[in-house]
């Protein structure tokens, strides 16, 4: 037995030595293989069934934590690729997930808090740099056009440098900027996208004083996915989510944050305490989401924009305690999770 262990150990040492020697003396050959592997990996297309809706939670965090990417959700239907909200880190995470940003068709913004749109200029630019050769339609409530007009000036020099370097045939500035599809909702909800059997309805939510704020209902092939946006418990969300196959809803653990406020006050961190106190009145606790989702007959519930994020066993248990009574499948989403609506 000892002889066998010595033999295995010696073999491992030999393999490690030879590997390090090869790396040291033949880095060019290895770099070619590595480059080839990376390109082939990045060229692999996502496996999307045209009868299904495929959803990725790119970012599931909130401004209160840095361990997760901020809000961002990718939706694939047939040959269409949409992203809903583009918070900090969404673009980088999307590339890590190998999502084909060069094929992006449209972006939908729920409201203008930075954790939902701060990466929008980067997404517009990055998808173009990666080869997007079609318009990128941006949908959002009032205020969107001003943001995109400012983004034109923000990216103008960057885009000029790209064209000067690579030429206009490679870097066609026709597609370098997002196309504004700003909308105003007159009667609580409005169909803003209706093409190729895909219908997307924007609807008002209650995130006061942040107005306008909206959620989105996505319908295709008798399937429905609803994204709540940021909101306190809102009956319209669950009206839109009635019989939904998938509801993606923000969540906040108010019970934990109330204690956090007291701790911050005791430490004389008054500014932080004030902010943590204020955010509790325009988000939704998990137990309220579960109650209303059960009434709406939601099949699968996914909680994201988790405040705080359940990245340790204690916080995770606090969430689980509040969602245990949901009648269907329920998930505390993580960055990079995938959900398929069949």
Regions found by a protein language model. Give the residues of each.
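Cap/insert and terminal regions of metallo-dependent hydrolase folds
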Residues: 2-23, 215, 224, 232-334
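Binuclear metal-dependent hydrolase catalytic cores
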Residues: 2-226, 315-341
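Short, solvent-exposed mixed-charge patches
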Residues: 247, 341-342
């Amino acid at each position: 037995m000892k002889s066998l262990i010595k033999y295995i150990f010696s073999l491992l040492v030999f393999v490690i030595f030879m590997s390090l020697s090869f790396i040291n003396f033949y880095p060019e050959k290895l770099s070619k293989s590595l480059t080839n592997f990376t390109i082939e990996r990045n060229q692999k297309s996502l496996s999307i069934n045209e009868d299904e809706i495929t959803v990725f939670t790119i970012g599931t965090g909130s401004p209160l934590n840095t361990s997760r990417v901020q809000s961002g959700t990718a939706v694939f239907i047939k040959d269409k690729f949409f992203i809903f909200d583009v918070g900090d880190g969404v673009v980088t995470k999307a590339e890590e997930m190998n999502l084909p940003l060069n094929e992006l068709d449209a972006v939908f913004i729920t409201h203008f808090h930075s954790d939902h749109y701060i990466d929008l200029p980067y997404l517009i630019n990055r998808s173009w740099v990666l080869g997007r050769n079609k318009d990128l339609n941006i949908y959002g409530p009032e205020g969107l056009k001003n943001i995109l007009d400012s983004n034109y000036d923000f990216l103008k020099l960057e885009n000029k440098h790209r064209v000067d370097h690579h030429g206009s045939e490679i870097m066609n500035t026709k597609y370098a900027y997002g196309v504004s599809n700003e909308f105003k909702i007159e009667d609580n909800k409005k169909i803003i996208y209706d093409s190729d059997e895909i219908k997307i309805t924007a609807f008002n939510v209650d995130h006061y004083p942040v107005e306008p704020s909206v959620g989105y209902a996505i319908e295709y092939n008798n399937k429905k996915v609803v994204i709540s946006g940021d909101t306190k418990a809102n009956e319209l969300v669950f009206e839109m989510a009635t019989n939904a196959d998938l509801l993606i809803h923000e969540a906040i653990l108010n019970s934990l944050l109330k204690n956090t406020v007291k701790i911050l006050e005791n430490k004389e961190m008054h500014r932080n305490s004030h902010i943590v106190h204020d955010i509790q009145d325009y988000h939704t606790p998990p137990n309220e989401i579960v109650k209303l989702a059960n009434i709406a007959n939601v099949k699968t519930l996914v909680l994201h924009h988790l405040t705080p994020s359940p990245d340790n066993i204690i916080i995770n248990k606090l969430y689980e305690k509040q969602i245990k009574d949901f009648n269907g499948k329920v998930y505390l989403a993580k960055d990079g999770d995938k959900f398929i609506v069949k």
